[in-house]
Amino acid sequence: TDEATSAYEQIVLQFPEHPLAADAQYKLAQAHEESGDFDEALEAYVTLAATYPRSPLIANVMIRISDHFYKNEEFPIAAEVGKKFLEKFEGHQFASRMAFRVGQCFYKAEKFGTAGESFDLFAKSFPDDELAADSMFWSGESFRMANNDREAFRRYNRCRWDFPASDAAKYARGRLALPEMLRQFEAEANSVENDN
């Protein structure tokens, strides 16, 4: 791949204004990535974004960068790249996947409140997506891990009501049987009685 890297570098250097120069820059970054040198790949991706900011390849660049940091368990960085992606490319075909990934990143980084909010945003932004039930369950999990039983209880119930046939609803029903969720059920029932 040294030959490929060299060839792409030559194209970018000799023909920076050519319509395919951005493609060559992207291929250069991929060649570095495939050879295991992500630092060089990252530099080439950043150069692509800076030099060709209108390139349709920018979305792919951001996905690859976020993926790299996710796979290397650098979840806060992966989440930030994902959030920037969603700001720039909200209508992209992979926007829902990236939005879900942002929630996963915050959860794995143990930023549970932010994870819950991210999964809620996913459910609001992509209500018909195949991951909508999972996002509601994971919102519940996130809030439960943040010791916010009230919000967790509500997300588990919403998952169960809105997506009754899903695997996520099955897991949500299991979580609702936890002692802290049963206590929350009693607290909510008592508050309804007291309001009447």
Predicted segments with their positions:
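Acidic, polar-rich low-complexity tracts and alpha-helical solenoid repeat scaffolds
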Residues: 1-196
